[in-house]
Amino acid sequence: MDKLLIFGGLPLKGEVTISGAKNAALPIMASTLLAQGVHIFKRIPKLRDVFTMTELIKRMGGIVEFNELCKINTIKINKFEASYDLVKTMRASILVLGPLVARFGRAKVSLPGGCAIGARPVNLHINGLQKMGAKISLQEGYIIAKASRLMGTKIYFDIPTVTGTENLMMAATLAKGTTIIENAAKEPEIVDLANYLILMGAKIEGAGTSIIKVEGVDELKPPQEYEIIPDRIETGTFIAIAGACGGDISLKGCRIDHIDAIILKMKDAGISFKEIENGIRVIGPKRLQAVDIKTMPYPGFPTDMQAQFMAMMTVANGTSVIKETIFENRFMHVAELRRMGADITVEGNTATIRGVKKLKGAPVMATDLRASASLVIAGLIAEEETLIDRIYHLDRGYEELDKKLIQLGARIQRIK
């Protein structure tokens, strides 16, 4: 199992190209099951979760080529199962459920695994598909779904759900009639998925708002080559790295219109930004200022940036308060940051961080994807060596993060 050895305390300077968004790539890859033919993508990141989705599609009969471009051939899809051994490693595997039921009238998908950061129930997906006419049962840990043809309906989410919105939007594209999804999630990744579905011939209005309207069509067809949006969480993570290290980093290929809340809070912490061609330049201060945040659905401050922001705040001037409102059990990185000298207390969904002048390197363990990124940030600003175990979590969501950091001047070694 790989580990990362980080020698902290070095200034980071240079240029980084932001990878394609994992959370856009995964649903768009799942959407290829809706349309027979060859789908061609630019900027799909080479990540553990992407390779899991690739294997899922291959086992169903798809052919996937992964070079500079990603090509997915769905002509010979003849199996409709997502097995436990793959789904347990990635919750986003549930995204094949809607497309399979919509196009083939059946699906067998294992209940999800993936991050250990909360229940993330799939009942919203199941309830929505049932409203569209699917017959669904749970058998031995699998969701078994059948439908002759899904029917358009009105669906209301009690709470906005990103994967639920994506799954039901995909399913609705081939349903008979009109589907309206109310209290839909608004994330940019949902808009990117909708844009790809529209290019395939889907009729979708309102993606990126709380009400999405989908008029079903009889058939979808693969469009020309499509480019995935840049990863806003990777962008935010590198902003946090620049801020924490007092760095000067240019981020190329990012979309600043996707990260308004992140940029506003980073500015409050003392980080400076300059727009450059096709990106932004991020300049960290001599010392960060403490800032409070509350995680919220998009366009609020993203829960996927909470751990990285906390790592910054461990060495900020003053006391900051972080409220986590999206997922329970998402402060698992706190114990590891404390091992490095951070002064953090947690009560319920609220963490209070009293900034210290220095962190000290220590052996620590990654518990989930974004927690692993927070430990990398802590390691970069700490004195002496930090050894991070279980970095397979990091590889699930960041494309060659260690190599990108080395380009900026970090001393990092991957240990097998």
Curated annotation (Swiss-Prot):
Pfam families xrefs: EPSP_synthase (PF00275)
Homology family: Belongs to the EPSP synthase family. MurA subfamily.
BP GO terms, sorted: cell division; cell wall organization; peptidoglycan biosynthetic process; regulation of cell shape; UDP-N-acetylgalactosamine biosynthetic process
Binding sites annotated in the UniProt record for UDP-N-acetyl-alpha-D-glucosamine: R91, D304, I326
Function per UniProt: Cell wall formation. Adds enolpyruvyl to UDP-N-acetylglucosamine.
Pathway(s): Cell wall biogenesis; peptidoglycan biosynthesis
InterPro entries: Enolpyruvate_Tfrase_dom, Enolpyruvate_Tfrase_sf, MurA_subfamily, RNA3'P_cycl/enolpyr_Trfase_a/b, UDP_GlcNAc_COvinyl_MurA
Record field: catalytic activity: phosphoenolpyruvate + UDP-N-acetyl-alpha-D-glucosamine = UDP-N-acetyl-3-O-(1-carboxyvinyl)-alpha-D-glucosamine + phosphate
Molecular function terms from GO: UDP-N-acetylglucosamine 1-carboxyvinyltransferase activity
Protein EC: 2.5.1.7
Signal peptide region: none
Sites where the protein binds phosphoenolpyruvate: K22, N23
Cross-referenced Gene3D superfamilies: Enolpyruvate transferase domain
Main location group: cytoplasm
Name of the protein: UDP-N-acetylglucosamine 1-carboxyvinyltransferase
Record PTM 2-(S-cysteinyl)pyruvic acid O-phosphothioketal, positions in chain: C115
Cellular component annotations (GO), alphabetically ordered: cytoplasm
Localization terms from the record: Cytoplasm
Residues at the active site: C115 (proton donor)
CDD domains: UdpNAET (cd01555)
Keyword set, alphabetical order: Cell cycle, Cell division, Cell shape, Cell wall biogenesis/degradation, Cytoplasm, Peptidoglycan synthesis, Pyruvate, Transferase
